[in-house]
Amino acid sequence: MPPLPQNYAQQQPSNWDKFKMGLMMGTTVGVCTGILFGGFAIATQGPGPDGVVRTLGKYIAGSAGTFGLFMSIGSIIRSDSESSPMSHPNLNLQQQARLEMWKLRAKYGIRKD
């Protein structure tokens, strides 16, 4: 039975996937930051008329929304520069050279230690 064909390159995530990943990472950081700063503000200044839970929730929601928004936008901006083929004209040549080196190493049993 012949071996299965191997894919040498994996498909990159789409911009929508990068947006969602940035949103989730930013929201997670925002929740942690909101708990820390909100807890500190409540401990030093008191909860105010809304109470502890509602005040802490406001801090968490505000920082989670802000961090999530900026991280998602930043991940899209960062991924736009990689999508243009003219940004790295020698990238295809570099990938071909690596593939040929990999084939030669596999053919002659040369291991990189």
Curated annotation (Swiss-Prot):
Domain of life, source organism: Eukaryota
Membrane topology, Extracellular segments: 44-56
GO cellular component: a single term: mitochondrial inner membrane
Topological relation to the membrane, as annotated: Multi-pass membrane protein
InterPro entries: Romo1/Mgr2 (IPR018450)
Record localization: Membrane
Alphabetized UniProt keyword annotations: Membrane, Transmembrane, Transmembrane helix
Pfam families named among the record's database cross-references: Romo1
Transmembrane residue ranges: 23-43, 57-77
Regions of this protein lying in the Cytoplasmic compartment: 1-22, 78-113
Keyword Membrane: yes
Keyword Transmembrane among record annotations: yes
Coiled coil: none
GO biological process: protein import into mitochondrial matrix; protein insertion into mitochondrial inner membrane
Function: Required for cell viability in cells lacking mitochondrial DNA.
Family: Belongs to the MGR2 family.
Name under which the protein is recorded: Protein MGR2
Organism this protein belongs to: Saccharomyces cerevisiae (strain ATCC 204508 / S288c)
Gene designation: MGR2
